[in-house]
Amino acid sequence: MIVTPKFRGFICTTSHPVGCEYSVMNQVEYIKNQKKINGAKKVLVIGASTGYGLASRITAAFGCGAATIGIFFERPGSKNKTASAGWYNSAAFEKMAKEEGLYAKSINGDAFSNEIKQKTIDLIKKDLGKVDMVVYSLASPRRTHPVTGEVFNSVIKPIREAYTSKTVDFHTQLVSETTIEPASDDEIRQTIAVMGGEDWSMWMDALKKADVLEDNVMTLAYSYVGPEVTHSVYREGTIGKAKDDLEATAIKINENLRTIGGKAYVSINKAVVTQASAAIPVISLYVSALFKVMKEKNIHEGCIEQMYRMFNDRLYSGDLKLDSKGRICMDDLEMRPEVQNEVTKLWNEANNDNVKDITDIEGYRREFFRLFGFEFEDVDYNADVDIEVNIEGLY
């Protein structure tokens, strides 16, 4: 099948198997070209198929030489429908890990469920005994509670009052004003249930009870703070409330892990292009301006560069450089005052006439397409490709 990008709103409904493999290969090569990290050896990544979760798995495997188990919920390909990008990413990762002689197995299913938690515990016991690192990097729009059965849906909305701001449609490159109505109390509650810390805590409880955590285990979850311009819709909005809950959960997990010397951290990561962030008005314009400034200053990072820096310079360097709230700050380059001042200036100036020139909207658009395996110069998109790809180590 010849695969081209197809869209439904902000969602790209197709993905390219060869392009996704090429993307993973680039990330693997980046890590293999860095100095080795004396770090984790047996790693569980919950949410391992895209973005920061995938980059964490690649860094652990190819940077630390770790055995990895990845949990994700992805769609395989069929005769006439491509798989989701995360499926192709995971297939490529497993293939490359195997070639390198690294242990890699994956479980495809709902990480929020008790069933997948148990399946993961069984696999750890069978193959690894215990794990010394657990990365929690789930990005899901909904969650079925494993105890009550309630289905929660997350929303990206401001709280208390409507928010009006500039945004840019990266398909048309048109700047416009958008207004987002505030969330109801129930929408806030549901967003916290999906994107807060409860499931992370449930995972760590289950893993500890099953005795599959090594002494001095480390667990990480990822968050974002960002600048003032995004706060109404992000940090002070519904997602921010969920992230507050996630950060509070780290304290609870620390208590729980104390008996085995374990530690839980939240890492505040930088803004990158993800399927999730593309759906947030305001973020696309902010990230386009941020890319422009950080690339000019030669401090731009994607997921993989950032995860290597986190593992090498923070987690296993002996100095986590925690902030006053006990968080790891990987947004340090993004939040430099000189970067933010320039980004704010570009933000204020951006309009339909100049957005292509003063921001990196083109770079943002290309990054978005690359999430699905498109727009890589070295991939032949006119070639007929097999869209049914197996993941070798699926358990």
Curated annotation (Swiss-Prot):
InterPro entries: Eno_Rdtase_FAD-bd_dom, Enoyl-CoA_Rdtase_cat_dom, FabV-like_NADH_b, Trans-2-enoyl-CoA_reductase. Keywords: Fatty acid biosynthesis, Fatty acid metabolism, Lipid biosynthesis, Lipid metabolism, NAD, Oxidoreductase. GO terms for biological process: fatty acid biosynthetic process. NAD(+) binds at residues 47-52, 73-74, 110-111, 138-139, 243, 272-274. Its EC number is 1.3.1.44. GO terms for molecular function: enoyl-[acyl-carrier-protein] reductase (NADH) activity; NAD binding; trans-2-enoyl-CoA reductase (NADH) activity. The keyword Cell membrane does not apply. Involved in the fatty acid synthesis (FAS II). Catalyzes the reduction of a carbon-carbon double bond in an enoyl moiety that is covalently linked to a coenzyme A (CoA). Belongs to the TER reductase family. PANTHER family: ENOYL-[ACYL-CARRIER-PROTEIN] REDUCTASE [NADH] (PTHR37480:SF1). This is Trans-2-enoyl-CoA reductase [NADH]. It comes from Ruminiclostridium cellulolyticum (strain ATCC 35319 / DSM 5812 / JCM 6584 / H10). The lineage of its organism: Bacteria, Bacillati, Bacillota, Clostridia, Eubacteriales.
